[in-house]
A protein has these predicted regions:
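Fe(II)/2-oxoglutarate
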Residues: 1-54, 314-317
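Non-heme Fe(II)-dependent double-stranded beta-helix
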Residues: 28-54, 61-159
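Residues that flank catalytic or metal-binding motifs in active/ligand-binding sites
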Residues: 97, 104, 135, 169-171, ...
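A structural signal for well-ordered alpha-helical segments within the folded catalytic domains
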Residues: 115-119, 171, 213
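A structural signal for short, well-ordered beta-strand segments
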Residues: 136-139, 173-175, 240-244
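Short Ser/Thr-interspersed hydrophobic loop/turn segments at strand-loop and sheet-helix junctions
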Residues: 140, 179-180, 223-224
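Catalytic core of non-heme Fe(II) oxygenases with the double-stranded beta-helix
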Residues: 146-212, 249-259
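Conserved double-stranded beta-helix
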Residues: 196-219, 223-224, 229-317
Length: 317
């Protein structure tokens, strides 16, 4: 893959650019520039969340090691090979979308539940909900010759409901399982598009390729206009798409069938809860006699409580 993405390996250019982007993300004038702020694995969640809510997108460079990526691909390759191509232009007629990663790959947990990603997500989604949950897990394999995906907003999956303009209901991530560059179909994003009208999806000339090295991750919000890039290289471009949503919204990937109880109970408890085996709000997701789903999953009684939260009744006087 290196021959398609030489920008990352020539003359220290990427290191210099990454430093520049990291500086720009703290510069008020960068708001008007078509760049994606870059961060490192040692950056603070506060700084990343601030840039994400300002620009709508950030890249955290080399957040996991190549060995972690290779472990994931080794476990998932048989499932990728068996995945059919998409049946429409949006899904991608030369693109494979392979899901159910929690059930199929132990190595996926390194990325699906990465502490820094979850901390950033909590800082943003925590403003609008008691909890957040996993929305989907999917390896996207874009074959050579694939055209660019139509631009869109991820939160349109909620029946195109018009949420309040400044409200974030979803945080999306795409992990680079190969080096991402414009030539091989790096995800294209429209920086500063959070408040843009929906008609901006036609402005493909304003998009920027999320170029990054293997093991890096691009994060963007449900309001950010973006789309998969055209793969003009000779190799498949692979990325891991993991999205998170508010605890009171429906998940795109049905985790309870994709990762059923007999598999879910083998996962770490924080991952079980992230997948949705938990109370989503004080009265959402309980089991039978108002029992906590995580307790039931793990063979505990679970009591009888609407989440154990104190409910503050609005003052309607």
């Amino acid at each position: 893959m290196n021959f398609t993405c030489k920008i990352y390996h020539s003359g220290g250019f990427f290191t210099t650019a990454r430093s520049l982007y990291s500086t720009l993300c703290h510069d008020v004038y960068a708001r008007d520039m078509a760049v994606i702020p870059h961060f490192t694995r040692s950056s603070s969640a506060d700084d990343i969340a601030s840039a994400l809510t300002s620009f709508g997108c950030v890249i955290i460079d080399e957040l996991v090691d190549h060995q972690q990526v290779e472990a994931l691909l080794s476990e998932m390759q048989p499932f990728i090979d068996a995945t059919p191509l998409g049946q429409d232009d949006f899904t991608g007629r030369t693109t494979q979308r392979t899901g159910a990663l929690l059930a199929r790959s132990a190595a996926s947990i390194d990325m699906v539940a990465h502490p820094l990603v979850l901390e950033v997500t909590q800082k943003i989604l925590g403003l609008s909900a008691t909890t957040f949950q996993l929305h989907l897990t999917q390896i996207i394999s874009i074959s050579p010759g694939a055209p660019a995906q139509p631009l869109h907003r991820d939160q349109w999956c909620f029946d195109f409901f018009e949420f309040p303009a400044e409200m974030d209901v979803e945080i999306s991530t795409i992990w680079a399982l190969d080096d991402f560059c414009e030539l091989n179909g790096a995800t294209r994003v429209l920086p500063n598009s959070l408040m843009e009208p929906s008609s901006a999806v036609t402005q493909t000339d304003r998009t920027v390729a999320a170029e990054m090295t293997k093991g890096s991750v691009v994060m963007y919000t449900g309001r950010t206009i973006h789309g998969g890039g055209a793969n003009q290289s000779t190799a498949v471009r692979r990325g891991l798409n993991v999205d998170y949503i508010l605890g009171w919204l429906r998940q795109e990937e049905n985790q309870y069938l994709s990762c059923p109880p007999e598999i879910a109970r083998t996962l770490p408890e924080n991952v079980q809860r992230l997948a949705g085996y938990a109370i989503g709000a004080y009265a959402l997701g309980y089991v039978d006699d108002v029992r906590d789903p995580n307790a039931v999953l793990n063979g505990r009684d679970g009591g009888s409580s609407f989440g154990g939260l104190e409910i503050n009744t609005p003052n309607l006087a």
